[in-house]
Amino acid sequence: MKPQARATEDLDDLVHVMDHGAVCDTERRGHHRPQGRSPLDLVVDASEGFVPLWEKDTTLRWRFRDRSFESFADPDAAKAAVRTLFGEALLAWGDAAPVRFVQDNDVWDFEIVIRQSDECSIKGCVLASAFFPDGGRHKLTIYPKMFEQVGQERLETLIHEIGHIFGLRHFFALLSEEDWPAQVFGEHREVSIMNYGANSQLTDQDKADLRKLYEMAWSGELTHINGTPIRLVRPYHVVGIPTRFAIPTLGTVRMA
Protein backbone atom coordinates (compact mmCIF):
# COMPACT_ATOMS: atom_id res chain seq x y z
CA MET A 1 0.00 0.00 0.00
CA LYS A 2 1.14 3.56 -0.68
CA PRO A 3 1.80 5.87 2.28
CA GLN A 4 -1.30 7.99 2.93
CA ALA A 5 0.41 11.25 1.97
CA ARG A 6 1.49 9.77 -1.38
CA ALA A 7 -1.94 8.24 -1.99
CA THR A 8 -3.60 11.58 -1.27
CA GLU A 9 -1.25 13.34 -3.67
CA ASP A 10 -1.96 10.80 -6.42
CA LEU A 11 -5.71 11.14 -5.91
CA ASP A 12 -5.40 14.89 -6.36
CA ASP A 13 -4.77 14.08 -10.03
CA LEU A 14 -7.94 12.03 -10.33
CA VAL A 15 -10.74 13.72 -8.44
CA HIS A 16 -12.50 17.05 -8.47
CA VAL A 17 -12.73 18.37 -4.90
CA MET A 18 -15.56 20.86 -4.57
CA ASP A 19 -15.65 21.79 -0.87
CA HIS A 20 -15.24 20.18 2.55
CA GLY A 21 -14.09 16.95 0.90
CA ALA A 22 -16.89 16.99 -1.68
CA VAL A 23 -15.69 15.49 -4.96
CA CYS A 24 -17.56 15.25 -8.27
CA ASP A 25 -17.33 11.75 -9.73
CA THR A 26 -18.61 12.48 -13.25
CA GLU A 27 -15.18 13.38 -14.62
CA ARG A 28 -11.54 13.58 -13.71
CA ARG A 29 -9.65 16.70 -12.86
CA GLY A 30 -7.59 18.65 -15.40
CA HIS A 31 -4.37 20.48 -14.73
CA HIS A 32 -3.19 23.09 -17.18
CA ARG A 33 -4.27 26.41 -18.61
CA PRO A 34 -3.82 25.92 -22.36
CA GLN A 35 -2.92 28.99 -24.37
CA GLY A 36 -2.98 31.07 -21.20
CA ARG A 37 -6.75 30.80 -20.75
CA SER A 38 -8.27 31.73 -17.44
CA PRO A 39 -9.92 28.86 -15.53
CA LEU A 40 -12.99 31.07 -15.24
CA ASP A 41 -14.48 30.17 -18.62
CA LEU A 42 -17.38 27.99 -19.62
CA VAL A 43 -15.95 24.55 -20.41
CA VAL A 44 -17.69 21.98 -22.60
CA ASP A 45 -16.98 18.29 -23.14
CA ALA A 46 -14.68 17.26 -25.99
CA SER A 47 -13.52 13.87 -24.75
CA GLU A 48 -14.42 12.10 -28.02
CA GLY A 49 -12.55 14.54 -30.27
CA PHE A 50 -15.63 16.68 -30.77
CA VAL A 51 -17.94 18.76 -28.59
CA PRO A 52 -21.22 16.85 -28.13
CA LEU A 53 -24.30 18.98 -27.60
CA TRP A 54 -27.92 17.91 -27.67
CA GLU A 55 -29.86 18.36 -30.89
CA LYS A 56 -32.58 21.01 -30.87
CA ASP A 57 -35.96 19.95 -29.45
CA THR A 58 -34.44 17.01 -27.59
CA THR A 59 -36.41 15.43 -24.77
CA LEU A 60 -34.59 13.08 -22.41
CA ARG A 61 -36.72 10.26 -21.06
CA TRP A 62 -35.91 8.97 -17.61
CA ARG A 63 -37.18 6.49 -15.07
CA PHE A 64 -36.39 5.34 -11.55
CA ARG A 65 -34.51 2.08 -11.13
CA ASP A 66 -37.16 0.64 -8.85
CA ARG A 67 -35.02 -1.96 -7.12
CA SER A 68 -32.56 0.71 -5.99
CA PHE A 69 -35.33 2.21 -3.80
CA GLU A 70 -36.30 -1.06 -2.12
CA SER A 71 -34.15 -0.39 0.95
CA PHE A 72 -36.33 2.61 1.88
CA ALA A 73 -39.15 2.03 4.37
CA ASP A 74 -41.46 3.82 1.93
CA PRO A 75 -40.04 3.55 -1.62
CA ASP A 76 -42.83 5.66 -3.12
CA ALA A 77 -42.18 8.50 -0.67
CA ALA A 78 -38.46 8.30 -1.43
CA LYS A 79 -39.16 8.51 -5.15
CA ALA A 80 -41.44 11.48 -4.60
CA ALA A 81 -38.72 13.28 -2.64
CA VAL A 82 -36.09 12.61 -5.30
CA ARG A 83 -38.51 13.61 -8.07
CA THR A 84 -39.16 16.92 -6.30
CA LEU A 85 -35.45 17.59 -5.81
CA PHE A 86 -34.69 16.73 -9.44
CA GLY A 87 -37.50 19.02 -10.58
CA GLU A 88 -36.22 21.88 -8.45
CA ALA A 89 -32.74 21.45 -9.92
CA LEU A 90 -34.15 21.58 -13.46
CA LEU A 91 -36.23 24.64 -12.64
CA ALA A 92 -33.10 26.39 -11.39
CA TRP A 93 -31.67 26.25 -14.93
CA GLY A 94 -34.92 27.76 -16.22
CA ASP A 95 -35.23 28.51 -19.93
CA ALA A 96 -31.47 28.09 -20.33
CA ALA A 97 -31.95 24.32 -20.18
CA PRO A 98 -31.30 23.04 -23.73
CA VAL A 99 -33.38 19.88 -23.34
CA ARG A 100 -36.66 18.82 -21.79
CA PHE A 101 -37.11 15.90 -19.40
CA VAL A 102 -40.03 13.51 -19.11
CA GLN A 103 -40.51 10.41 -16.99
CA ASP A 104 -41.04 7.30 -19.12
CA ASN A 105 -40.83 3.83 -17.62
CA ASP A 106 -40.83 2.03 -20.97
CA VAL A 107 -38.46 3.76 -23.40
CA TRP A 108 -35.84 5.62 -21.39
CA ASP A 109 -32.51 7.36 -21.88
CA PHE A 110 -31.30 7.35 -18.29
CA GLU A 111 -32.25 5.98 -14.90
CA ILE A 112 -32.14 7.70 -11.53
CA VAL A 113 -30.39 5.22 -9.27
CA ILE A 114 -29.90 5.29 -5.50
CA ARG A 115 -26.78 3.46 -4.36
CA GLN A 116 -27.17 1.33 -1.27
CA SER A 117 -23.74 2.18 0.12
CA ASP A 118 -21.28 5.03 -0.13
CA GLU A 119 -18.18 5.05 -2.29
CA CYS A 120 -15.39 6.66 -0.31
CA SER A 121 -11.66 7.24 -0.45
CA ILE A 122 -9.25 9.28 1.64
CA LYS A 123 -10.43 12.31 -0.37
CA GLY A 124 -14.08 11.92 0.55
CA CYS A 125 -17.30 10.16 -0.44
CA VAL A 126 -19.19 10.34 -3.71
CA LEU A 127 -22.39 12.38 -3.60
CA ALA A 128 -23.64 11.91 -7.17
CA SER A 129 -22.53 11.25 -10.72
CA ALA A 130 -24.09 11.88 -14.12
CA PHE A 131 -23.13 11.71 -17.83
CA PHE A 132 -22.38 13.78 -20.92
CA PRO A 133 -24.48 14.04 -24.12
CA ASP A 134 -24.50 10.98 -26.37
CA GLY A 135 -26.86 8.35 -27.75
CA GLY A 136 -26.35 5.76 -25.04
CA ARG A 137 -28.28 4.75 -21.97
CA HIS A 138 -27.01 6.25 -18.74
CA LYS A 139 -27.50 6.73 -15.01
CA LEU A 140 -27.88 9.69 -12.71
CA THR A 141 -26.56 8.06 -9.56
CA ILE A 142 -27.21 9.40 -6.07
CA TYR A 143 -25.23 8.13 -3.08
CA PRO A 144 -26.41 8.04 0.56
CA LYS A 145 -23.99 10.82 1.55
CA MET A 146 -25.91 13.31 -0.58
CA PHE A 147 -28.89 13.00 1.74
CA GLU A 148 -26.68 14.17 4.61
CA GLN A 149 -26.28 17.56 2.93
CA VAL A 150 -28.42 20.50 3.95
CA GLY A 151 -31.19 21.50 1.54
CA GLN A 152 -29.40 24.10 -0.60
CA GLU A 153 -26.18 22.06 -0.84
CA ARG A 154 -28.17 19.01 -1.93
CA LEU A 155 -29.96 21.07 -4.56
CA GLU A 156 -26.70 22.56 -5.86
CA THR A 157 -25.23 19.05 -6.15
CA LEU A 158 -27.99 18.07 -8.59
CA ILE A 159 -27.84 21.40 -10.44
CA HIS A 160 -24.11 20.73 -10.95
CA GLU A 161 -24.72 17.18 -12.20
CA ILE A 162 -27.43 18.38 -14.59
CA GLY A 163 -24.81 20.79 -15.94
CA HIS A 164 -22.80 17.73 -16.96
CA ILE A 165 -25.87 16.28 -18.69
CA PHE A 166 -26.04 19.51 -20.70
CA GLY A 167 -22.40 18.97 -21.73
CA LEU A 168 -20.59 21.22 -19.26
CA ARG A 169 -17.24 20.31 -17.70
CA HIS A 170 -15.36 21.40 -14.63
CA PHE A 171 -13.12 24.43 -14.84
CA PHE A 172 -10.06 22.29 -14.13
CA ALA A 173 -10.93 20.18 -17.18
CA LEU A 174 -9.48 22.97 -19.32
CA LEU A 175 -7.95 21.40 -22.31
CA SER A 176 -4.89 19.83 -22.48
CA GLU A 177 -5.46 16.47 -21.01
CA GLU A 178 -5.36 14.05 -23.91
CA ASP A 179 -7.59 11.52 -22.14
CA TRP A 180 -10.17 14.04 -20.92
CA PRO A 181 -10.06 17.01 -23.30
CA ALA A 182 -12.45 19.94 -23.05
CA GLN A 183 -13.02 23.16 -24.92
CA VAL A 184 -13.73 26.69 -23.73
CA PHE A 185 -16.69 28.81 -24.77
CA GLY A 186 -17.56 32.23 -23.38
CA GLU A 187 -16.37 33.64 -20.09
CA HIS A 188 -17.37 33.22 -16.47
CA ARG A 189 -16.86 35.10 -13.30
CA GLU A 190 -15.34 33.18 -10.44
CA VAL A 191 -18.71 32.11 -9.07
CA SER A 192 -20.19 29.31 -11.22
CA ILE A 193 -22.10 26.11 -10.59
CA MET A 194 -19.32 24.23 -12.44
CA ASN A 195 -16.64 25.74 -10.18
CA TYR A 196 -15.53 24.75 -6.69
CA GLY A 197 -16.41 25.18 -3.04
CA ALA A 198 -18.20 28.35 -1.99
CA ASN A 199 -17.94 29.51 -5.62
CA SER A 200 -20.03 26.57 -6.85
CA GLN A 201 -23.29 28.48 -7.28
CA LEU A 202 -25.58 28.79 -10.28
CA THR A 203 -25.41 32.32 -11.69
CA ASP A 204 -27.26 34.31 -14.34
CA GLN A 205 -24.01 34.28 -16.32
CA ASP A 206 -23.94 30.47 -16.24
CA LYS A 207 -27.40 30.39 -17.75
CA ALA A 208 -26.71 33.15 -20.28
CA ASP A 209 -23.56 31.41 -21.57
CA LEU A 210 -25.30 28.03 -21.81
CA ARG A 211 -28.25 29.55 -23.65
CA LYS A 212 -25.95 31.36 -26.09
CA LEU A 213 -23.85 28.24 -26.69
CA TYR A 214 -26.84 26.16 -27.72
CA GLU A 215 -28.57 28.90 -29.70
CA MET A 216 -25.43 29.46 -31.78
CA ALA A 217 -24.84 25.73 -32.26
CA TRP A 218 -28.44 25.05 -33.30
CA SER A 219 -28.50 27.96 -35.75
CA GLY A 220 -25.26 26.82 -37.40
CA GLU A 221 -23.53 30.06 -36.44
CA LEU A 222 -21.15 28.10 -34.21
CA THR A 223 -19.74 24.90 -35.71
CA HIS A 224 -16.38 24.69 -33.90
CA ILE A 225 -15.03 25.76 -30.53
CA ASN A 226 -11.32 26.56 -30.64
CA GLY A 227 -10.97 24.34 -33.69
CA THR A 228 -12.86 21.38 -32.23
CA PRO A 229 -16.03 20.50 -34.17
CA ILE A 230 -19.44 20.54 -32.51
CA ARG A 231 -21.58 17.46 -33.03
CA LEU A 232 -25.29 17.57 -32.25
CA VAL A 233 -26.38 14.27 -30.76
CA ARG A 234 -29.72 12.55 -30.22
CA PRO A 235 -30.71 10.45 -27.20
CA TYR A 236 -31.03 6.69 -26.99
CA HIS A 237 -34.79 6.56 -27.44
CA VAL A 238 -34.29 8.05 -30.92
CA VAL A 239 -31.05 6.42 -32.10
CA GLY A 240 -31.03 3.23 -30.04
CA ILE A 241 -34.32 1.71 -31.17
CA PRO A 242 -35.37 0.36 -34.59
CA THR A 243 -35.97 3.10 -37.16
CA ARG A 244 -39.64 2.20 -37.61
CA PHE A 245 -40.23 3.08 -33.95
CA ALA A 246 -38.10 6.23 -33.86
CA ILE A 247 -39.77 9.59 -33.46
CA PRO A 248 -38.56 12.06 -36.13
CA THR A 249 -36.66 15.07 -34.79
CA LEU A 250 -35.74 18.42 -36.31
CA GLY A 251 -32.34 18.15 -36.36
CA THR A 252 -19.86 12.77 -8.77
CA VAL A 253 -19.67 14.59 -6.27
CA ARG A 254 -17.97 13.32 -3.12
CA MET A 255 -18.26 14.44 0.48
CA ALA A 256 -16.04 13.73 3.48
Which role fits each region the language model picked out?
Residues 69-81, 141-149, 195-200:
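Second-shell loop/turn segments in exported
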Residues 67-69, 117-119, 169-172, 199-201, ...:
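Acidic glycine-/aspartate-rich tracts in secreted/extracellular proteins
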